[in-house]
Protein backbone atom coordinates (compact mmCIF):
# COMPACT_ATOMS: atom_id res chain seq x y z
CA UNK A 1 0.00 0.00 0.00
CA UNK A 2 1.33 3.42 -1.04
CA UNK A 3 0.16 6.73 0.42
CA UNK A 4 0.22 10.40 -0.51
CA UNK A 5 -0.93 12.92 2.08
CA UNK A 6 -2.09 16.34 0.87
CA UNK A 7 -2.05 19.11 3.46
CA UNK A 8 -3.14 22.70 3.10
CA UNK A 9 -0.97 25.09 5.11
CA UNK A 10 -2.08 26.33 8.55
CA UNK A 11 -3.97 29.59 8.99
CA UNK A 12 -2.06 32.54 7.53
CA UNK A 13 -2.27 36.19 8.50
CA UNK A 14 -4.44 36.92 5.46
CA UNK A 15 -6.63 33.86 6.06
CA UNK A 16 -7.35 35.43 9.44
CA UNK A 17 -8.06 38.81 7.83
CA UNK A 18 -10.14 37.11 5.08
CA UNK A 19 -8.02 38.57 2.28
CA UNK A 20 -7.23 37.21 -1.17
CA UNK A 21 -3.67 35.96 -0.75
CA UNK A 22 -2.52 34.12 -3.86
CA UNK A 23 1.23 34.50 -4.35
CA UNK A 24 1.61 37.12 -1.60
CA UNK A 25 4.11 35.64 0.86
CA UNK A 26 2.31 36.11 4.17
CA UNK A 27 3.27 34.24 7.34
CA UNK A 28 1.40 31.82 9.56
CA UNK A 29 -0.55 33.09 12.56
CA UNK A 30 -0.05 31.58 16.01
CA UNK A 31 -3.20 29.58 15.32
CA UNK A 32 -1.73 28.43 12.02
CA UNK A 33 1.44 27.22 13.73
CA UNK A 34 -0.67 25.34 16.29
CA UNK A 35 -2.74 23.79 13.47
CA UNK A 36 0.42 22.61 11.72
CA UNK A 37 1.81 21.12 14.93
CA UNK A 38 -1.50 19.34 15.54
CA UNK A 39 -1.42 17.89 12.02
CA UNK A 40 2.09 16.58 12.63
CA UNK A 41 1.05 14.97 15.89
CA UNK A 42 -1.99 13.39 14.23
CA UNK A 43 0.11 11.96 11.41
CA UNK A 44 2.61 10.57 13.91
CA UNK A 45 -0.16 9.00 16.01
CA UNK A 46 -1.46 7.29 12.87
CA UNK A 47 1.92 5.80 12.08
CA UNK A 48 2.94 7.80 9.03
CA UNK A 49 6.62 7.71 8.03
CA UNK A 50 7.28 9.85 4.99
CA UNK A 51 10.03 9.12 2.51
CA UNK A 52 9.93 12.55 0.89
CA UNK A 53 8.03 15.83 1.08
CA UNK A 54 7.13 18.56 -1.40
CA UNK A 55 6.02 22.13 -0.85
CA UNK A 56 5.72 25.51 -2.57
CA UNK A 57 7.95 28.59 -2.50
CA UNK A 58 5.60 30.38 -0.08
CA UNK A 59 6.50 30.56 3.60
CA UNK A 60 3.06 29.64 4.93
CA UNK A 61 3.43 26.23 3.28
CA UNK A 62 7.15 25.85 4.02
CA UNK A 63 6.68 26.65 7.71
CA UNK A 64 3.68 24.32 7.96
CA UNK A 65 5.81 21.51 6.54
CA UNK A 66 8.61 22.32 8.99
CA UNK A 67 6.20 22.18 11.94
CA UNK A 68 4.71 18.89 10.76
CA UNK A 69 8.07 17.18 10.28
CA UNK A 70 9.35 18.51 13.60
CA UNK A 71 6.40 17.02 15.49
CA UNK A 72 6.88 13.74 13.64
CA UNK A 73 10.66 13.65 14.34
CA UNK A 74 11.16 13.41 10.59
CA UNK A 75 13.02 16.68 9.96
CA UNK A 76 15.73 14.76 8.10
CA UNK A 77 13.68 13.55 5.13
CA UNK A 78 14.35 15.06 1.68
CA UNK A 79 12.22 18.12 0.91
CA UNK A 80 11.75 19.62 -2.55
CA UNK A 81 10.25 23.06 -3.15
CA UNK A 82 8.64 24.19 -6.39
CA UNK A 83 6.94 27.37 -7.53
CA UNK A 84 4.53 25.13 -9.43
CA UNK A 85 2.90 24.20 -6.09
CA UNK A 86 2.16 27.85 -5.27
CA UNK A 87 -1.40 28.99 -4.67
CA UNK A 88 -3.61 30.20 -7.52
CA UNK A 89 -2.57 33.74 -8.49
CA UNK A 90 -5.46 36.10 -7.75
CA UNK A 91 -4.25 38.97 -9.91
CA UNK A 92 -5.29 42.42 -8.77
CA UNK A 93 -7.58 40.93 -6.10
CA UNK A 94 -4.54 40.05 -3.98
CA UNK A 95 -4.70 41.91 -0.68
CA UNK A 96 -8.42 42.75 -0.89
CA UNK A 97 -10.82 41.64 1.84
CA UNK A 98 -13.16 38.92 0.50
CA UNK A 99 -16.27 40.04 2.39
CA UNK A 100 -15.79 43.70 1.44
CA UNK A 101 -15.25 42.67 -2.18
CA UNK A 102 -18.44 40.57 -2.03
CA UNK A 103 -20.38 43.52 -0.61
CA UNK A 104 -19.18 45.63 -3.54
CA UNK A 105 -19.51 43.13 -6.40
CA UNK A 106 -21.90 40.49 -4.98
CA UNK A 107 -21.42 37.00 -3.56
CA UNK A 108 -21.86 35.37 -6.96
CA UNK A 109 -19.11 37.40 -8.65
CA UNK A 110 -16.66 36.75 -5.81
CA UNK A 111 -17.48 33.04 -5.93
CA UNK A 112 -16.67 33.11 -9.66
CA UNK A 113 -13.34 34.81 -8.99
CA UNK A 114 -12.52 32.41 -6.16
CA UNK A 115 -13.71 29.11 -7.56
CA UNK A 116 -14.69 29.35 -11.23
CA UNK A 117 -12.83 26.75 -13.24
CA UNK A 118 -11.85 28.93 -16.19
CA UNK A 119 -12.47 32.58 -15.26
CA UNK A 120 -9.50 34.52 -13.84
CA UNK A 121 -9.55 37.84 -11.95
CA UNK A 122 -8.10 40.92 -13.65
CA UNK A 123 -4.36 40.54 -14.19
CA UNK A 124 -1.60 42.53 -12.51
CA UNK A 125 0.04 45.09 -14.77
CA UNK A 126 3.63 44.50 -15.85
CA UNK A 127 4.90 47.30 -13.58
CA UNK A 128 2.79 46.33 -10.54
CA UNK A 129 5.18 45.73 -7.60
CA UNK A 130 3.19 42.58 -6.79
CA UNK A 131 4.19 41.07 -10.15
CA UNK A 132 6.24 37.91 -9.40
CA UNK A 133 8.82 38.83 -12.04
CA UNK A 134 10.27 41.31 -9.53
CA UNK A 135 10.94 38.63 -6.87
CA UNK A 136 14.34 36.97 -6.53
CA UNK A 137 12.83 33.58 -5.76
CA UNK A 138 11.43 33.35 -9.30
CA UNK A 139 14.56 34.50 -11.17
CA UNK A 140 15.13 31.05 -12.67
CA UNK A 141 11.53 30.78 -13.92
CA UNK A 142 10.97 32.01 -17.50
CA UNK A 143 9.03 35.25 -17.39
CA UNK A 144 6.43 33.89 -19.80
CA UNK A 145 5.58 31.13 -17.29
CA UNK A 146 5.05 33.46 -14.33
CA UNK A 147 1.35 34.29 -13.91
CA UNK A 148 -0.12 37.78 -13.51
CA UNK A 149 -3.47 36.14 -12.71
CA UNK A 150 -4.90 32.61 -12.91
CA UNK A 151 -8.12 30.67 -13.10
CA UNK A 152 -8.28 27.25 -11.46
CA UNK A 153 -7.76 25.78 -14.95
CA UNK A 154 -4.56 27.80 -15.31
CA UNK A 155 -3.41 26.70 -11.85
CA UNK A 156 -3.95 23.04 -12.69
CA UNK A 157 -2.06 23.41 -15.98
CA UNK A 158 0.85 24.86 -13.99
CA UNK A 159 0.83 22.08 -11.39
CA UNK A 160 0.17 18.97 -13.48
CA UNK A 161 3.57 18.71 -15.22
CA UNK A 162 5.26 18.75 -11.80
CA UNK A 163 2.77 16.25 -10.38
CA UNK A 164 2.99 13.86 -13.33
CA UNK A 165 6.75 14.08 -13.91
CA UNK A 166 8.14 14.54 -10.39
CA UNK A 167 5.81 13.81 -7.46
CA UNK A 168 3.67 10.89 -8.58
CA UNK A 169 6.48 8.85 -10.23
CA UNK A 170 8.35 8.94 -6.90
CA UNK A 171 5.59 6.75 -5.47
CA UNK A 172 7.10 3.86 -7.42
CA UNK A 173 10.04 3.74 -5.00
CA UNK A 174 8.60 5.57 -1.97
CA UNK A 175 5.87 4.26 0.30
CA UNK A 176 4.61 7.57 1.73
CA UNK A 177 4.85 11.10 0.33
CA UNK A 178 3.72 14.38 1.91
CA UNK A 179 2.65 17.39 -0.16
CA UNK A 180 2.09 20.64 1.74
CA UNK A 181 0.63 23.35 -0.45
CA UNK A 182 -2.43 25.58 -0.87
CA UNK A 183 -6.19 25.36 -1.26
CA UNK A 184 -6.33 25.75 -5.03
CA UNK A 185 -3.11 23.97 -5.96
CA UNK A 186 -4.25 20.98 -3.91
CA UNK A 187 -7.73 21.24 -5.40
CA UNK A 188 -6.14 20.73 -8.80
CA UNK A 189 -4.34 17.57 -7.67
CA UNK A 190 -7.53 16.21 -6.08
CA UNK A 191 -9.51 16.93 -9.26
CA UNK A 192 -6.97 14.91 -11.22
CA UNK A 193 -6.83 11.99 -8.78
CA UNK A 194 -10.59 11.66 -8.30
CA UNK A 195 -11.67 12.67 -11.82
CA UNK A 196 -13.90 15.44 -10.46
CA UNK A 197 -15.78 17.49 -13.05
CA UNK A 198 -15.09 21.17 -13.71
CA UNK A 199 -18.49 22.01 -12.20
CA UNK A 200 -18.07 19.96 -9.01
CA UNK A 201 -14.51 20.96 -8.15
CA UNK A 202 -15.62 24.50 -7.26
CA UNK A 203 -17.66 23.02 -4.39
CA UNK A 204 -14.66 21.36 -2.71
CA UNK A 205 -13.57 23.25 0.40
CA UNK A 206 -10.24 22.31 1.97
CA UNK A 207 -9.75 23.36 5.61
CA UNK A 208 -6.33 24.47 6.82
CA UNK A 209 -3.92 21.83 8.15
CA UNK A 210 -6.24 18.81 7.93
CA UNK A 211 -4.39 15.81 6.41
CA UNK A 212 -6.09 14.34 3.34
CA UNK A 213 -4.85 10.79 2.75
CA UNK A 214 -4.83 8.99 -0.60
CA UNK A 215 -4.06 5.27 -0.60
CA UNK A 216 -2.81 3.51 -3.73
CA UNK A 217 -2.20 -0.09 -4.70
CA UNK A 218 1.32 -1.21 -5.55
CA UNK A 219 0.28 -0.66 -9.17
CA UNK A 220 -0.47 2.98 -8.21
CA UNK A 221 -4.24 2.74 -8.63
CA UNK A 222 -6.20 4.92 -6.20
CA UNK A 223 -8.04 2.70 -3.73
CA UNK A 224 -9.22 4.99 -0.94
CA UNK A 225 -9.12 8.62 0.21
CA UNK A 226 -10.09 10.17 3.54
CA UNK A 227 -9.44 13.06 5.90
CA UNK A 228 -7.66 12.38 9.19
CA UNK A 229 -9.58 13.75 12.16
CA UNK A 230 -13.04 14.08 13.63
CA UNK A 231 -15.61 14.09 10.76
CA UNK A 232 -17.95 16.60 12.41
CA UNK A 233 -15.12 19.01 13.20
CA UNK A 234 -13.84 18.72 9.62
CA UNK A 235 -17.35 19.37 8.25
CA UNK A 236 -17.56 22.60 10.27
CA UNK A 237 -14.13 23.69 9.07
CA UNK A 238 -15.15 23.09 5.45
CA UNK A 239 -18.31 25.11 5.96
CA UNK A 240 -16.25 27.99 7.35
CA UNK A 241 -14.03 27.95 4.25
CA UNK A 242 -17.11 28.03 2.00
CA UNK A 243 -18.42 31.13 3.80
CA UNK A 244 -15.20 33.16 3.48
CA UNK A 245 -16.19 34.81 0.22
CA UNK A 246 -19.65 35.96 1.29
CA UNK A 247 -20.61 39.46 2.31
CA UNK A 248 -21.37 39.94 5.99
Swiss-Prot record:
Q: Which GO terms describe its molecular function?
A: phosphoglycerate mutase activity
- Catalytic positions are 9, 87
Provide the GO biological process annotations: gluconeogenesis; glycolytic process
Q: Which reaction does it catalyse?
A: (2R)-2-phosphoglycerate = (2R)-3-phosphoglycerate
* UniProt-annotated binding residues for substrate: 8-15, 21-22, 60, 87-90, 98, 114-115, 183-184
Keywords in alphabetical order: Gluconeogenesis, Glycolysis, Isomerase
Enzyme class, first EC level, given as a word: isomerase
Asked if the Swiss-Prot or TrEMBL record annotates the protein with the keyword Metal-binding, the reply is no
Family as reported in the entry's similarity comment = Belongs to the phosphoglycerate mutase family. BPG-dependent PGAM subfamily.
Its recorded name reads: 2,3-bisphosphoglycerate-dependent phosphoglycerate mutase
Per the UniProt record, the source organism is Bacteroides fragilis (strain ATCC 25285 / DSM 2151 / CCUG 4856 / JCM 11019 / LMG 10263 / NCTC 9343 / Onslow / VPI 2553 / EN-2)
Q: Which gene encodes it?
A: gpmA
Amino acid sequence: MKKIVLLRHGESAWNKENRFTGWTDVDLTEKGIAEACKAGELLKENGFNFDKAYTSYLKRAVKTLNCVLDRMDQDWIPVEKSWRLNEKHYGDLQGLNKSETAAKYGDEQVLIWRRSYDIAPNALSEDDPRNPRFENRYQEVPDAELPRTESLKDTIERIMPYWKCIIFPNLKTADEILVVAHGNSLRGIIKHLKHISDEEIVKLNLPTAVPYVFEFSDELNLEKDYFLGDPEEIRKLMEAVANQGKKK
